[in-house]
Structures are given as C-alpha cells and as structure tokens.
Amino acid sequence: MNAIIAEPGHVSFDDLARVYAGAAIALGPAYWPRVEAAAAIVAKAAQGAEPVYGINTGFGKLASKRIPPDQTALLQRNLILSHCCGVGPATPEPIVRLMIALKIISLGRGASGVRRQIVDQLQAMLAQGVCPFVPQQGSVGASGDLAPLAHMTAVMIGEGQAFVEGRLVPGREALAHVGLDPVTLGPKEGLALINGTQFSTAYALAGLFRARDLLNAALVTGALSVDAAMASTAPFRPEIQALRGHPGQIAAGRVLTELVDGSAIRLSHLEGDERVQDPYCLRCQPQVAGAALDLLTQAARTLVNEANAVTDNPLVLVETGEIISGGNFHAEPVAFAADQIALALSELGAISERRIATLVDPALNFGLPPFLTPQPGLNSGFMIAEVTAAALFAENKQRALPCSIDSTPTSANQEDHVSMAAHAARRLHDMADNLAHIIGIELLVAAQGIELRVPHGTSAALSAVIGALRSHVPALESDRYMADDLAKAAALVAGGALARAANVALGRDSFPRLG
C-alpha cells in the first residue's frame, strides 16, 4: 500500500481509514520549512535567560524548577522514561500505527518546535513496521495521553519495547532490525511527542471505523428482519423521512427501501394484510439507525478535526516567534465523540435484539414456527441465541454510560480536570465486539425466517446476503452446536461482508458515508 502524502490540517477521513488499514504516511514537502522554523525558535529559547515551560523548566507541578542549558537533553530523556507508566495488554498494532500517523500530522503543522529528524524517525518506524509496545491503560486524556505516547517515544530513543515482524524485542533492537538509529531528543522534543491526544484519537477513530461497518450491517439485517416478519416497508418511504428532515434518517430509509425492493415476500402481502402497524423495532428503523448515523457523522467531523490538530503544549507561533502555553492537550472533544459513538453502538444493538426477539416469538413473527426451528419442542432452535443477544446488549448498555463526565484531579491538583478520553475510546472496541455478535445473531435468525417463507423469496440484494452467509453457515434444520455458527456470523458482520454482498447485487455502493 502506497504511503499517503500528508497535508497537515487537510488529512481526510478516508486517508485515516487507509492508515488504519495499513498505509504509511509521509509529510508533504511544503510543510518542512515551517517545522524547521519552529525548531529554530525553540533552540533559541533553550539558550535564553527567560523560563519557557518544558524547554528549560520542569514539568507539571515542577514547572517552577529551572533547568540549565547543558541538561535540556537529559531533561527530555528523563521525561520519557519517567512517563512510561502504562499498564495492561498491548494496544493493537493498527491503532498504534494510526497513533504514530496522527503524531506525524500534528508535528507537521510546525507549531511544536521539533527538528525534522524527529518526524523522520516516526515516518521511518511507520513505513518499516516498527510497532512500539504501548500498554492500553494509564491515560486520563489530559495533559494529553502522556503514558501511551511515552511508550511510543521510548522506542524512538532506543528504549522500551516494540514489535517487529511479530516479535516483541527491545526498542534498540527493533530500530537496528530495520536499519534505524536511536535519536537524541533536543529541547521540548520529548514534551512535544508525549503531550497530545493521539492515543485517544486513534482509539476513537478505530472505534468509529468499526461502528460505520456495523451500522451498515445493521441496516442489512434490519431489512432481512422486515422481510422475515412480513412487515411493511411503507414507513421507509422517502416522503415520511423528508417530513422530519434528519439526514441520517433520510439515508437509512433509502437504504432499507433499496435492500427490500423486488422482494416476492413483500409483494405477497401488499394486499389483504390485517396488521395495521408493525412493532417499533421494525417500523422505526430509519429513526433509530438514522439517529445513530447522525451521531457517527458528527463524531467523524470532530475526530477528523482532532486528527489534523496540534494538541501539545506549549505551542510555537512561527509568525511572531512566541512560545505560548495553552490547553490543546485536553481531550474533551475526543471524549465527547467517543461517548457519541458508544450511544450509537448501544442503540443499534438494542433495536437489533428486539428484532431477534420478534422473529423467534410465534406470537409476533406472523406465522413462523417458535424459535424458527421446523420441529419445535424436540429442537430449541434459536431460543438461547436470542438470550445471548440480550446479554450482550445489557453489557453494551452499561458501557454506553458517558465516560467524559468522570473527571478526577491528578498531578498534585495541577491537572485538576481531565477528560477520560482514552477510557471512553478504548471501551468502544468491547462494545463493537458485542454488537457484531448481536447483529450476527440477527443475520442467522432473519435469514432462517426468510427461508421458511417458501415458496416466496426475498429481494436480489438480500438473497445475495443470505448466499454469503450460507457459504459459511448452513440453515438450521435441527439443533446443533451453535457457538461456531454465531462466531462465523459475527465475523461476516464485522468484516463488512453483508454490505459488500448487497452492493454487488445492487450494482452500486448504496450505504451512507461518514467522511
């Protein structure tokens, strides 16, 4: 995959998704002069008599301690080593790579005061597959993601640990394996590298990418459930959505209509159906999935903006030569965005679980056998699969509680309000795993329901989706070991197979975009 030439301030959602998928990133040539100009301002300040935070002073509560010029390099090294306090399992490699890319973008804005060789080192590590071991826990999202970014920076200076070709080795060995030497940090460079929101933002973006794919899958399984339940598609008509006007609702209604279009099941009950209205889990899909889409779209705007931002402290104003302390490291926007994503994930699971419950209940599923097994009683069918979906939804509901309201003072009360953005973003991945299983269960249940509607068939798009499922999981004719079926269905959901199959049948990309 070719490297993306980054224009800091203008990196797109799709660019970030490509980095998450494995692309490297390189700073565009037009941005180097500003990087070097900011570094020159810092170098001059380091030799001056005036105290400048993080350049010739201590850090945090120790900012009043002056550091002589001959100890500024040691100051930065000590900062990195002392801040490597992360705990817990390793952050997944795609997220670490995205974090490094975000740091390159931030430094490339030319307001951090680092030398070119610092950015070059990050670019080389990213391009050559040096992935620092970054523990998942230890950041409160202000003053930036200090501990996680310190673990990244430790590898740059030959310390810490990194993965190379799947092996965890000492940082110096990892660099040598790809022909790199450790760098020596100059004034402010350690602080610029660890002060920022890149860990939280990378985790939140990764959660957003997964949420986008899960939303698309939920639209597909929601359409399958509509046909399996012989529900009405009239509530999806564009006139209904337009009268409310929310963009996500309009898009969701359109997708649901396109997916079911041409279904013989639908045509079979256009007339003579005594039911006046369907349950909300079927009828209100545009309103719920659409609201989730709008939340994800808003979160995408916030996170793309943050990905292009300068979030360390202090910042260098090249035009005036000033070095100004601020608070861009506070990750409240990221925490809010992560909380929004969590709400969307939770509600997509909530309504999917209700559709599953509707389809397995003979009082609600309009003529299908109990728990969708041809021989109920002897067989239990999808009885406990629905219970599993309920259990997973309950977990996600608890995880969806906002993390951004849970501040606690740190650093001798100097950092007295924090965002908890890292925790807010990390929990998205457990939620996404749960949601993939919930939607996977709906896929199994709805496909079974449609196949029990013979001789009537579903639409071309939904038939293609069922075909993709059946290449991995056969229909449930009698009880069997179910865990493998659930795992395979969840993998199809998480991997985007449902939307791809539908798009091939439709001959176009019918699903909404976030960026």
Swiss-Prot record:
Q: How is it modified after translation?
A: Contains an active site 4-methylidene-imidazol-5-one (MIO), which is formed autocatalytically by cyclization and dehydration of residues Ala-Ser-Gly.
Q: Write out the entry's keywords from A to Z.
A: Cytoplasm, Histidine metabolism, Lyase
> Which molecular-function annotations from GO does this UniProt entry contain?
histidine ammonia-lyase activity
Q: Which Gene3D superfamilies match?
A: Fumarase/aspartase (Central domain), Fumarase/aspartase (N-terminal domain)
Q: Where is this cross-link: 5-imidazolinone (Ala-Gly)?
A: 142-144
| The protein's annotated pathway | Amino-acid degradation; L-histidine degradation into L-glutamate; N-formimidoyl-L-glutamate from L-histidine: step 1/3
| Enzyme Commission numbers on file | 4.3.1.3
Catalytic activity, reaction form: L-histidine = trans-urocanate + NH4(+)
2,3-didehydroalanine (Ser): residues carrying this PTM: 143
Which EC class is the enzyme in? lyase
NCBIfam families assigned to the protein according to its UniProt record, in alphabetical order: hutH, PRK09367.1
The name under which this protein is listed is: Histidine ammonia-lyase
Per the record, the similarity remark reads: Belongs to the PAL/histidase family.
Any one biological process term the GO annotation gives: L-histidine catabolic process to glutamate and formate
